[in-house]
A protein has these predicted regions:
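Active-site-adjacent segment of FAD-dependent monooxygenases/related oxidoreductases
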Residues: 1, 99, 181-184
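Active-site/ligand-binding neighborhood in enzyme catalytic cores
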Residues: 1-36, 43-44, 55, 62, ...
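Active-site rim elements
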Residues: 4-12, 83-90, 146-155, 165
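Non-transmembrane alpha-helical segments in soluble domains
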Residues: 19-23, 38, 162-169
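Generic structural signal for small/hydrophobic residues in well-ordered secondary structure
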Residues: 22, 60, 99-100, 141, ...
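Conserved flavin/dinucleotide-binding core of flavoenzymes
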Residues: 45, 54, 94, 109-192
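Core beta-strand elements of the Rossmann-like FAD/NAD(P) dinucleotide-binding domain
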Residues: 49-58
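Central beta-strand plus flanking loop segment that forms part of the substrate or channel wall
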Residues: 80-110
Length: 192
C-alpha cells in the first residue's frame, strides 16, 4: 500500500487487487463467483441461492453482520444473536461515492493534493484516487446527502459532483473521461 493522506493507506490497484490476490490462492474449481449463499447447516452443508450445495469443513463469513442475518442458519442463532446481527450497522452501508477519471492528475501540476473537505456539496470528503503512477488520474468523493434524499436523484448528483470538482480543481475537472456513482444504500450485499 501507499499513503495518500496522512494516517491512511491505499492498496495499489484498489480493493479488487486484494480480492484477486486472495482468489489466486484458491483452486479455480473451488471458487464460486456470483453464488449467493441462501442457507448454512452447521454440519457443513452450504446451499446457494440457485439450489446447488457443497459440503465444507470450515465456513467463514466475511460479510456485513446484517447480511449474515439474511442467510438461513441451522441450527439457528439464539434470538439475542439474531437481533445483534440486525442491529450492527454496516460501515459505509448508507453512503455513496462518486468517482471521476481523467487522462492525468492535472490538479497535481497546480500544486493541489486532490484532498478536500467541504460543507457545500454534495460531496463532503474528496480524495485523489489516481493510480500510484498517476495514470489514469482520478478524484473521488463521499456524498453528504442522506440516502432518502439521494433516492432517484442519480443524474442530478452526477452533475452536481462534476460541478463541485470544477469549483475545487478548475475547469479541466468539468470534463472527466469516465464517471461512476456508487450508492451502497441500495446494494443488498452491503446494506439490508
Amino acid at each position: 500500500g501507499y499513503a495518500s493522506m496522512e494516517g491512511s493507506y491505499r492498496i495499489e490497484g484498489g480493493m479488487m487487487a486484494l480480492v484477486a490476490a486472495l482468489a489466486s490462492q484458491i483452486a479455480p474449481p473451488r471458487l464460486r463467483l456470483d453464488a449467493p449463499v441462501a442457507e448454512i447447516d452447521q454440519s457443513g452443508i452450504v446451499t446457494f441461492a440457485n439450489g446447488d450445495t457443497i459440503t465444507a469443513e470450515r465456513i467463514v463469513l466475511a460479510i456485513p453482520p446484517r447480511v449474515i442475518a439474511t442467510i438461513k442458519i441451522t441450527p439457528d442463532f439464539d434470538a439475542a444473536v439474531q437481533q445483534s446481527l440486525i442491529n450492527i450497522p454496516t460501515w459505509m452501508g448508507g453512503q455513496a461515492k462518486f468517482v471521476a477519471t481523467y487522462a492525468r492528475p492535472f490538479w497535481r501540476q497546480q500544486g493541489l493534493s486532490g484532498d478536500a473537505m467541504g460543507r457545500h456539496g454534495p460531496m463532503v470528503e474528496i480524495h485523489d484516487a489516481s493510480a500510484k503512477d498517476g495514470t489514469p488520474g482520478a478524484l473521488f468523493g463521499f456524498i453528504g446527502v442522506p440516502a432518502a434524499q439521494r433516492d432517484g436523484q442519480s443524474d442530478a448528483l452526477r452533475t452536481a459532483c462534476i460541478a463541485q470538482f470544477g469549483r475545487l480543481f478548475g475547469p479541466e475537472a468539468l470534463t472527466p473521461q469516465k464517471i461512476e456513482l456508487r450508492d451502497w444504500a441500495y446494494a443488498p450485499q452491503t446494506a439490508t
